[in-house]
Amino acid sequence: MSPVLAGVLQLVALIAALALAYRPLGDYMAKVYSSDKHLRVEKWIYKGIGADPDTQMRWPAYLRGVLAFSAVSVLFLYVLQRVQGSLPGSLGFRSIDPDQAFNTAASFVTNTNWQSYYGEQAMGHVVQTGGLAVQNFVSASVGIAVAVALVRGFSRSRTGELGNFWSDLVRGTVRVLLPVSVIAAIVLVACGAIQNFSGIHSVGQFMGGSQQWNGGAVASQEAIKEAGTNGGGYFNANSAHPFENPGPFSNLFEIFLILLIPFALTRTFGRMVGSLRQGYAILATMVTIWIGFTALMMWTEFAHHGPAFQIAGGAMEGKETRFGVGGSSIFAVATTLTSTGAVDSFHSSFTGLGGGITLLSMQLGEIAPGGTGSGLYGILIMAVIAVFIAGLMVGRTPEYLGKKIGTREIKFAACYILITPALALVFTAAAMALPTPGHSMTNSGAHGFSEILYAYTSGANNNGSAFAGLNADTQWFNTTIGIVMLLGRFVPMVFVLALAGSLAEQKPIPATVGTLRTEKPLFTGLLVGAILIITGLTYFPALALGPLAEGLAS
């Protein structure tokens, strides 16, 4: 079987698996977030944290809950790393330095999982399981909660109430993420991923000498790392490591986990707003971009540019032979179009245009299908922008799902789409202009610029992957990327919740003959066009200096 055919068959199998899971999971999540009942274990949690799950919150109160919980999480994870040397199960590792502890705490709480450290050489069992893995669950649940709050803004009327943050947080963790992760961990263990609390083993090598291998609760962390679109690896090699991702089936299964919840949330959206066709329109937009980018990536990586590529069956530099070009390309697009950032290959070693696709995938705002929760609210913001543009073209007041998109709403949406590129581009410019950050670049020219741009784009979009030729473990990058991750996560949430509150207060407008039918293919095309044009206008100058220049030169 040719490598190209193998890659296409993997993509077909992945689409089929996602299609089978779409309806049951999407409907289940709609029931979870619409139910008035609380499980017994949830009641214990509410009692322990002193929260009343039945109190409805307006958007400022909901936002305070998000920020307070996240602030406490950052502080807890920072302290846990700083005292690691005194904890049992530390495997002899020292406590983490202040700048790196801040960067890691910000990274995992924001669902970014950017790592400027070697996991198997820095973090013991307690920090990995009691700190990082816990944040993998709750940071993903925070994202879903904010997305659900925005959906309620569309579905509710004449009220500013968006639900209860604490209830949404606990339900997302207990009823959605935990069950999915338990099943996924069992599958990964069956595939060969390790799951233990062993110490460091010294293993003899065929050529003489020895190698140090770490044990750990890898399968359980790998499951939520992918299902929660987190991405932080137990090992430095991330999902290229055989202990995390043993073979071709586990690789395809991990891609399935990455895409599962973000795609299914469009069904949840359709259920909660009372129109499944609205959810299908959003799904069609996501799928169009995802398949288009995947096909383009496979073409760039399979394209033969000389005898070495012909023999290898594509651009194999930086890729695992057990995954091949096809599996690595599908994984790379999935991980950058979502907020995952996990890698099974070395993105810096992709072709110039292939590396540009991973960068552009993040710059779209990770909305196809995007992160767990963040993908849905991101594309709904873009839908508001698209409706507004359509309204300007025909001279009508824009409406979406029966809600008027006025000056106030469009200001919130505009601020949302501006904050992330501003963070990425401003900090990239600062790093290139100042002398000290440049010392971390191992490559010069267009590729070196791409490394810096990729790092800040990854941080601002809460992705976490990297062009790993950059030495990011410095005070400058640990501090600035940490700040970018926090601002890139929580400032957009302010505008999302403010928009949700504004929409929830409105009286629904009945559809008329002139109302734009947002469930039709025409709107899907308009939305895809708006996403690509806005992204292109924002990032094209920077892309021209980096991956485009490198790709054309080669």
Curated annotation (Swiss-Prot):
Keywords: Cell membrane, Ion transport, Membrane, Potassium, Potassium transport, Transmembrane, Transmembrane helix, Transport. The chain crosses the membrane at residues 1-21, 60-80, 131-151, 174-194, 246-266, 279-299, 375-395, 412-432, 481-501, 525-545. GO terms for cellular component: plasma membrane. InterPro entries: KdpA. One of its GO terms (molecular function) is P-type potassium transmembrane transporter activity. It is found in: Cell membrane. Pfam families: KdpA. Signal peptide: none annotated. Its main location: membrane. It is a multi-pass membrane protein. Belongs to the KdpA family. Part of the high-affinity ATP-driven potassium transport (or Kdp) system, which catalyzes the hydrolysis of ATP coupled with the electrogenic transport of potassium into the cytoplasm. This subunit binds the extracellular potassium ions and delivers the ions to the membrane domain of KdpB through an intramembrane tunnel. The system is composed of three essential subunits: KdpA, KdpB and KdpC. This is Potassium-transporting ATPase potassium-binding subunit. It comes from Streptomyces avermitilis (strain ATCC 31267 / DSM 46492 / JCM 5070 / NBRC 14893 / NCIMB 12804 / NRRL 8165 / MA-4680).
